[in-house]
Amino acid sequence: CLLSRGLGDVYKRQGKHFLSFVDNHDVTRVASILTNKNHLPLIYALAFGMPGIPCVYYGSEWGAEGRKEEGDPSLRLSYEKPEWNELTDWISKLAEAKKHSEALNYGGFRSVVLTNHQCIFERRSEHERVLVAINASDQPYTAHFDAGCGTAQDLITGQPHDFGGGSELPPYSAAFWKMEH
């Protein structure tokens, strides 16, 4: 609730072009902070789904770890070559979805469902609506809400989504549902 209210205020006052990140060269890397590594892809889904321009600090797309208290060398690793993995693939899909979505780039923000382990929020522009859905639990979750339409397409996977009977989110999952017109 505070995030929605605070974000809404900043969003209206400052515009839609602020930079967002989950870690950088001055803080402990997010992969070192999270106690459950299944949450790592989800935090990036949140970053790419929220208003703003997501910035991925180099190495973080591979799940690089590093702690601020261990000094700069821990945070600013050098790499001989890319360490492409499933997280890299996931972030690439999120970036592609964001790149091609008017709502994710310029749309407003509205919270739809919020629990301790799940959130669904709407990004709406003049021509597009996208629901960003995240389940951070180790259990499946079925969300019941009025989507305002019957079907959508997941911008991450390309799969169709039917809102009839509730929307099931598998454990540790995220979706960007582009709503039908």
Residue locations for each model-derived region?
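Single conserved hydrophobic/aromatic residue that forms the stacking wall/gate
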Residues: 1-11
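Conserved glycine-rich, hydrophobic/aromatic-active-site segments
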Residues: 44
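Active-site clefts of carbohydrate-active enzymes
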Residues: 14-35
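Proline-centered turn/helix-capping motifs that create local helix->coil transitions or kinks
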Residues: 13-14, 103
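Carbohydrate-interacting/catalytic domains
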Residues: 5, 35-41, 51-56, 60-181
